[in-house]
Amino acid sequence: MSVGDETTIFDFGNQMPKDIHDTLEIVYNALEEKGYNPINQIVGYLMSGDPAYIPRLNDARNLIKRHERDEIIEELVRVYLKK
């Protein structure tokens, strides 16, 4: 196998999902309070990594930057699929 053919495995151990959940709740509420579409803004942040999608209101920007974007996506998929 060549170097690019191997599957990389991510293991986040026992990352506290509640912590990510709480962060997303705060971010969602801050976005709503500012009058933005929270889903579009969060997706924009997760896709681009640009923190400008998230407001500073209620420290939402700093809170979401505490988590790696791939950890947030993993938790969203896990909760969506109930796994």
Curated annotation (Swiss-Prot):
InterPro entries: IreB. It holds the Pfam family IreB. Belongs to the UPF0297 family. PANTHER family: UPF0297 PROTEIN YRZL. This is UPF0297 protein LCK_00468. It comes from Leuconostoc citreum (strain KM20).
